[in-house]
Design a protein with these regions (language model features):
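Short, acidic Ser/Thr/Gly-rich low-complexity loop/linker segments typical of extracellular
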Residues: 1-10
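Short strand-edge motifs at loop-to-beta-strand transitions and within beta-strands
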Residues: 9-11, 52-54, 157
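A short, solvent-exposed beta-strand micro-motif common in secreted/extracellular proteins
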Residues: 15-31
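Structured interaction patches on ligand/partner-binding surfaces of diverse proteins
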Residues: 27-57
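Divalent cation-coordinating acidic motifs and surrounding scaffolds
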Residues: 43-48, 74, 79-82, 149-152, ...
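A structural motif detector for short, solvent-exposed N-terminal "entry" segments of globular domains
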Residues: 58-117, 204, 213-227, 232-256
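The feature marks short-to-medium sequence segments in extracytoplasmic or secretory-pathway proteins
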Residues: 106-140
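Solvent-exposed beta-edge/loop recognition patches
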Residues: 130-367
Length: 378
């Protein structure tokens, strides 16, 4: 039964002993909320009246509604064999819930240092100085969308992080970002044209992310080897007001040096994150995201066209009504011993009309694998 406006549901049952349960799913600003409750041992007698009410207390659990489905940062080999090309980065966000997601004051951030194997000034005696401080430091600056971002249930958006153009016209191993849904482009703050050529005309200017820079540099240099990337919402505070508030700024033992300036993003604001370690620097790499945000890391071999791609939640996906006969198995896009343990080819299944539920345990070691081809090339 469905409850009325007062939260009541009515049943007509014979006398006996019953168990009542209730559940509800809601979504708000990038999160899914599941409310569940159960009450056992309800004795219904012949004298029971309509005035008798049984209350079922609901317990709330929260999960990410909008998740990072894919992060492509490693670049590819140039056609002439002269080296690698790395100005074609993108991220795909996916609505992993059953409700439409509308995100207000939506932002992109990355953690200093840019590479996991670099010296991390925030480590003190082997522990991150902010490990228990309920924030994540966003380095250099943040990108924010000046309007709401809406993603329908089971749908995705592509954000070009560099070069919202068709890179394959020059480098055939690259990707076409001229058809991206959104892009980062703010030439006043980040003017380096290698990173930010004029975006494709097919991307509306209203879909440009704007930058707020509190550090230094002519580009927002997301690592092509081992970034720590996250998405967040500033909720009731505008991104400009938040990012300009010097009370949130700090420089991690480099006082007065704007190169190291970060701003403290409250962990409650963070919607999703992924930490990447370089395969070549694995032994020297250290975590920058705290366990509450991402308890693990995924490994990347860069410059080969590989991408960090989220694993499928096999049980949840197979349980989706209507998926039978639409799911494609025998996934073969894994590489270097890394693959999706579900065996489901998510991209092929999506094209076949299936609804994919991705795994989200807040642990990139479990949630991601290295895919040998960017999904935009499928």
């Amino acid at each position: 039964a469905t409850t009325d406006a007062n939260g009541k549901a009515a049943f007509t049952v014979p006398a006996g002993i019953y168990e009542a349960s209730a559940s509800e799913k809601r979504a708000s600003n990038g999160y899914s909320f599941i409310l569940n409750g159960v009450k056992s041992g309800i004795t219904v007698t012949e004298t029971w009246t309509g005035d008798s009410v049984v209350e079922v207390a609901l317990t709330e659990s929260k999960s990410g509604q909008v998740i990072i489905k894919e992060l492509y940062v490693g670049g590819c080999q140039k056609d002439d064999g002269s080296g690698n090309y790395q100005y074609d980065k993108y991220v795909i966000l996916y609505n992993n819930s059953e409700q439409a997601a509308t995100l207000e004051n939506f932002c992109l951030g990355m953690v200093n240092p840019y590479n996991a194997n670099s010296t991390i000034n925030d480590y003190k005696d082997g522990v991150l100085s902010y490990a228990n401080d309920n924030y994540i430091p966003a380095g250099c600056g943040i990108w924010y969308l000046p309007r709401n971002l809406t993603i329908e249930a089971g749908k995705q958006v592509v954000i070009a992080l560099n070069g919202a153009i068709n890179h394959t016209l020059t480098y055939s191993n690259s990707v076409n970002l001229s058809t991206a849904d959104y892009c980062t482009y703010d030439i006043e703050d980040f003017s380096q044209t290698n990173y930010y050529p004029t975006p494709s005309e097919s991307i509306p200017t209203a879909n440009y992310f704007t930058a707020y820079k509190y550090g230094q540099g002519t580009a927002w240099v997301l690592s092509n080897q081992s970034p720590a990337f996250f998405i967040f919402s500033t909720h009731d505070v505008t991104p400009e007001v938040f990012a300009s508030n010097t009370d949130y700024h700090y420089t991690a033992d480099k006082e007065g040096n704007a190169v190291y300036r970060c701003t403290k993003v409250p962990t409650d604001w963070i919607l999703d994150a992924v930490e990447v370690f370089s395969q070549a620097q694995l032994a020297k790499s250290q975590k920058r995201l705290t366990p509450a945000i991402d308890a693990g890391y995924t490994v990347l071999t860069n410059a080969q066209g590989y991408t960090s791609y989220r694993n499928v939640d096999k049980q949840a996906t197979e349980a989706v009504e209507g998926n039978s006969g639409k799911l494609v198995y025998s996934y073969n896009y894994g590489t270097d011993g890394s693959t999706d343990p579900s065996g489901i080819d998510a991209e092929a299944s999506l094209k076949n009309g299936a609804r994919i539920i991705y795994q989200d345990t807040n642990n990139s070691t479990n949630d991601f694998h290295q895919r040998k081809q960017a999904s935009l090339r499928d």
